[in-house]
Structures are given as structure tokens and as C-alpha cells.
Swiss-Prot record:
Disulfide bonds: none
GO MF, any single term: mechanosensitive monoatomic ion channel activity
Gene3D superfamilies assigned to the protein according to its UniProt record, in alphabetical order: 1.20.5.220, Large-conductance mechanosensitive channel, MscL, domain 1
Organism annotation: Mycobacterium marinum (strain ATCC BAA-535 / M)
Kinase among keywords: no
Organism phylogeny: Bacteria, Bacillati, Actinomycetota, Actinomycetes, Mycobacteriales
Record's subcellular location: Cell inner membrane
Protein name, UniProt field: Large-conductance mechanosensitive channel
InterPro entries recorded: Mechanosensitive_channel_CS (IPR019823), MS_channel (IPR001185), MSC/AndL (IPR037673), MscL_channel (IPR036019)
Length: 151
């Protein structure tokens, strides 16, 4: 039972997935800190004046309460940064490698097909006695359609 579990964990797909999750989590934390410490303070300063500390992205709704759109904008920027990096550093290279593998497989299939055609042509040429016949009709006499009308 332990051996089967060890084989399951040692498969390439599981290990790759685990590495991707760990790296993705670490990268998400990095981008979140970048957004929280640099982007959000810059967004908070937009539209702030001396009379109010509410910017254009904070809407006061009374009694000291406000709707803070800065948090939503920061989360959106965070998502776009993570999605962009994952797309350009993981998805694009993966698709490129996958297409390259498909081309190599197609080349192998073409080579096999061309080899079969070559072998069939060589076999046909070695069996031919100067007369070309359709496959499967060797040795059958031509059909007799009776006397020709032009004779």
C-alpha cells in the first residue's frame, strides 16, 4: 500500500503540479505585497484634497462610513498581474512545446506513410513484367465485349 502511494507521488504529473502550486502561491504573495505596498497607496492619493481624506475611489455614505473602491481596484490589478505572468511564463511556453511535439509526431507519421508507399512501389515494380495492371487483377483475362462495330 505504501509502495503504491510512493509510485503515485513520484509520477511526473503530480510532482509538476505540486511545484506549480508552491511557486504560484509564492508568486501570488509577492504580487499581493507589491499591490498592497505600492499600487494601493498611489490609488488612495488620487483625488484627495485638504478637506477630506476620501479620494475619488472612496465614496462617503455617512456616519464615518465609506465604500472603498480602492480595495476592489487593487484586487483587480493583483489578478491581472498574476494572470499575465502565469499566461506568459507558463501557458505560452507550454503551448509552444506542445505544438513542437505535435509537429515531430506528424513528421514521424509522414515518414512511416512514405516508407510504406516506397515499399509498395518497390513490390509492384518487382512483380511487374512490363504490363501494368490494377491491384488484384493479375492473371485475369480482359473482358470480351463481342465484335467491335468499326471493323
Amino acid at each position: 500500500m505504501l509502495k503504491g502511494f510512493k509510485e503515485f507521488l513520484s509520477r511526473g504529473n503530480i510532482v509538476d503540479l505540486a511545484v506549480a502550486v508552491v511557486i504560484g502561491t509564492a508568486f501570488t504573495a509577492l504580487v499581493t505585497r507589491f499591490t498592497d505596498s505600492i499600487i494601493t497607496p498611489l490609488i488612495n492619493r488620487v483625488g484627495v484634497n485638504e478637506q477630506s481624506d476620501l479620494g475619488i475611489l472612496k465614496i462617503g455614505i455617512g456616519r464615518g462610513q465609506s465604500i472603498d473602491l480602492n480595495v476592489l481596484l487593487s484586487a483587480t490589478i493583483n489578478f491581472i498581474l498574476v494572470a499575465g505572468v502565469v499566461y506568459f511564463l507558463v501557458v505560452v511556453p507550454y503551448n509552444t512545446l506542445r505544438k513542437k511535439g505535435e509537429v515531430e509526431q506528424a513528421d514521424d507519421a509522414q515518414i512511416v506513410l512514405l516508407t510504406e508507399i516506397r515499399d509498395l512501389l518497390a513490390q509492384t515494380n518487382s512483380n511487374s513484367s512490363g504490363r501494368h495492371e490494377a491491384p488484384g487483377t493479375a492473371g485475369t483475362p480482359p473482358p470480351n465485349y463481342g465484335p467491335r462495330a468499326d471493323t
